[in-house]
Amino acid sequence: HAVYSKRAMAADMMAVMTELGHSQFFIAGHDRGGRVAHRLARDYPQAVTKLAVLDIAPTAMMYDTTDMHFATSYYHWFFLIQPAPFPETLISHDPKFFLESKMQHWGKDRSAITNDAFDEYLRCFSNPDTIHASCEDYRASASIDLEHDAADVGLKLDIPLLVLWGATAMVGNKYDMLAAWREVAV
C-alpha cells in the first residue's frame, strides 16, 4: 500500500510545489487531504510554514480510540481496508447506491451537493481503478501510515497550526480537538 501512503502523496505534492517554484508555502486540507497535509508538514518541515487541518483528529488517535460510535460513524474506514477485491467488488456492483448512501450518511441535506458534482463522483466511482485507489488509500492509512505516525511519536510540529471542526461533527464530539493536536504539535 506504500504508493497510496500519505508519505507518497505528500512527496507528490512537494514535487508539484517545487516545480511551481515554491520552496515554502502554507497548506490546508480537509479529511483525507488534511491527513496528507499533516504528513507533508512532518516530512518537509523546511517547506511548510503554516498548516490548517479541517475536521480531523490525528489518524493514530482515531484508530487507537475506536469504539462503537466511531466504528458506526466511520464504518467505511473498516470496510475499505478489507483485502481486495472484497470492497471493490461490492462498490462496483452498484456505485450509485454506494455514493448515495455515503452522501446521505455524511450530510443532512442531499441538496448540499449539486447534481453535476454527484454525477462527477459517480463517473469516477464507475471506474474500477478509482474504486481500487480509494480502497488502497484507506488500506495505507491502516497500515503503513500508522507505521510512519508511530515513528514520529514525540516529534512535535513546530509551525503555526489551525485546527477547525464542526460543532456537530463526530470528531468534534468525540475528541478534545485542541488537546488531540497538542499531542502532535507545539
Give the residues covered by each predicted segment.
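Flexible "cap/lid" subdomain of the alpha/beta-hydrolase fold that forms the substrate-access gate
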Residues: A2-A28, R35-V186
